UniProtKB/Swiss-Prot annotation:
PANTHER family: IMPORT ATP-BINDING PROTEIN, LIPOPROTEIN-RELEASING SYSTEM ATP-BINDING PROTEIN LOLD. This is Uncharacterized ABC transporter ATP-binding protein YclH. Keywords: ATP-binding, Nucleotide-binding, Transport. CDD domains: ABC_MJ0796_LolCDE_FtsE. Residues 4-226 form the ABC transporter domain. Belongs to the ABC transporter superfamily. SUPFAM superfamilies: P-loop containing nucleoside triphosphate hydrolases (SSF52540). InterPro entries: AAA+_ATPase (IPR003593), ABC_transporter-like_ATP-bd (IPR003439), ABC_transpr_LolD-like (IPR015854), MacB-like_ATP-bd (IPR017911), P-loop_NTPase (IPR027417). GO terms for cellular component: plasma membrane. It comes from Bacillus subtilis (strain 168). SMART domains: AAA. ATP binds at residues 38-45. One of its GO terms (molecular function) is ATP binding.
């Protein structure tokens, strides 16, 4: 069964006669790494906002594990069922980087016994050392904050992870490591990962690439993922 399903989803900003999306039907499964690409104005971030419960469709339904997200409630859905990595970071500025991660783990019911140790290990994997992990996030650079946001998503006990350009502020080596971690989440942890990216190289190593154009989309399954 699909983890997330769009059923005849339509969305528009001001006028129904000029929809951004119309009659979108697509399913997302656990164990898969999806990328979404498209030119500016095709609705990539809006699509991801719908998938992550940050916005609701104007028409149609979005189902999570067979249940309508509208019935679950957007706030409850975001808090309990999805981990979100957006460019705005959405971190708690007066908490430390470590506290941001462990608090999210508590909220989503992580079963890790030593949450602090696990979070520190994951932060180090994305280039945040222990000293930085114990600093308030408002003292960290934009790129460092992005790494904390990514780590928070990695550590939360949710089956769905949505990410908007998560490697945008990172150097090439760190970007490759982040993509590898997203792949591992999908393939080794059986998560559903949906990532918006402008990087065609990342799109090539995803399992399924969704290319948006105005009002429509195409889906390509990548046979060999390196």
């Amino acid at each position: 069964m699909s983890l997330l399903q769009f059923q005849q989803v339509g969305y528009w900003y001001k006028n129904k006669s000029q929809p951004l999306f119309q009659d979108i039907n697509i399913s997302f499964q656990k164990g898969k790494f999806y990328t979404i690409v498209g030119t500016s104005g095709t609705g990539k971030t809006t699509f991801l906002s719908l998938a992550g419960g940050l916005d609701a469709p104007k028409e149609g339904n979005i189902l999570y594990d067979g249940k309508a997200v509208s019935k679950i409630g957007l706030t409850n859905f975001r808090n309990q069922y999805v981990s979100i990595v957006f460019q705005a970071y959405n971190l708690l500025p007066y908490m430390t980087a470590l506290q941001n991660v462990t608090t999210a783990m508590e909220i989503t019911g992580s079963k890790e016994k030593n949450k602090e140790s696990y979070a520190l290990d994951m932060l180090q994997k994305v280039g945040i050392n222990e000293k930085q992990a114990r600093q308030k996030v408002l003292t960290l650079s934009g790129g460092q904050q992005q790494r904390v946001s990514i780590t928070r998503a990695f550590c939360c006990d949710t089956d769905l992870i949505v990410a908007d350009e998560p490697t945008g502020n990172l150097d090439e080596d760190t970007s490759k490591e982040i993509v590898r971690l997203f792949q591992d989440l999908a393939h080794k942890e059986d998560k559903c990962v949906i990532m918006v990216t402008h990087d065609e190289q990342i799109a090539k190593v995803s399992d399924i690439n969704i290319r948006l154009s105005r009002g429509s989309f195409t889906v390509k399954e990548n046979v060999a993922v390196v």
